[in-house]
């Protein structure tokens, strides 16, 4: 490993460390003891799941309590609008247009953050504490302070994510979510053993949970490394021993084309609304809806299943453009044996991608929901979904591949420099 790659890894770790430091900076004017007591009693619902994705920042009411979710939500909205309006889709493909597009995403993130921050501030009044619940200062002042604090925190996370993507290794936003989930693993393990010691969970249940986790990890690794290789042939003629030879190659198409995006998008759409509804303890109708959409309920997991399939198809169509691949092949003198260059190749690649996306979307949906079904059947008293495991393993594999690619690239540059 050369110095450049080592430097990128250190930069990535440094920014992730900064992210974890921010998780311990609380919003001024709140009763942290009341907040902790509230989250201890609500760890099994949407609040607990939202807290997990934020790296326990919510339970501390940190300035990054909203995490990166507002940015993800704004990205979802913009992607859907891009698919609807051709001018917006065209803007994304241009260099200057992409900058404008990202600026719109940032402005939308600010708007969503402010709306969510005000919602959280109002919800804190229902938490048992002083006259204003967990709020220790004037309500109007607190709403301004909390909105500014959470907006600052979310903007800092956006900046950290962009810096990691540009100067480090891997996708910055995915790594932030990864770090948040991983940071909660020690406390989750400790909490599980406490349940064993108190007799809430027996040894057989513990063994069952471990086996489910290991099986989930194995399935994710197996599928994430699976790909369909489409052989291609180039018409370049290489004169060797008076014979014309063709250069053979292939197009690798992953079984899971959409990567980790569908479960992240689906979680973002389900978790925060459920969290806001959970705080409406005075309204029986909203509380009933919140209970209905609890992560431990069937409705949440059915919606999760369907949303993941939708986003898998939606995002796959964005990241895999069969027409562009077919055009690039034709320009470079390449073709798929037995198929005409251009439209024929594009139709074939599109058909292959559609079949793979079908199985890939089902894999993502099943991995995100089946572990919960198994754990619920065992009678385990806490929520365990495969979404967190899926995100952690996928991001780890993706980051390792990018590091490996950069190592190979540096070796190639070294060999080119010495004349090989």
Curated annotation (Swiss-Prot):
Belongs to the SecY/SEC61-alpha family. Component of the Sec protein translocase complex. Heterotrimer consisting of SecY, SecE and SecG subunits. The heterotrimers can form oligomers, although 1 heterotrimer is thought to be able to translocate proteins. Interacts with the ribosome. Interacts with SecDF, and other proteins may be involved. Interacts with SecA. InterPro entries: SecY, SecY/SEC61-alpha, SecY_CS, SecY_dom_sf. This is Protein translocase subunit SecY. GO terms for biological process: intracellular protein transmembrane transport; protein targeting; protein transport by the Sec complex. The chain crosses the membrane at residues 9-29, 61-81, 104-124, 141-161, 173-193, 203-223, 257-277, 300-320, 355-375, 377-397. The central subunit of the protein translocation channel SecYEG. Consists of two halves formed by TMs 1-5 and 6-10. These two domains form a lateral gate at the front which open onto the bilayer between TMs 2 and 7, and are clamped together by SecE at the back. The channel is closed by both a pore ring composed of hydrophobic SecY resides and a short helix (helix 2A) on the extracellular side of the membrane which forms a plug. The plug probably moves laterally to allow the channel to open. The ring and the pore may move independently. It is a multi-pass membrane protein. One of its GO terms (cellular component) is plasma membrane. Keywords: Cell inner membrane, Cell membrane, Membrane, Protein transport, Translocation, Transmembrane, Transmembrane helix, Transport. It is found in: Cell inner membrane. Disulfide bonds: none annotated. The gene is secY.
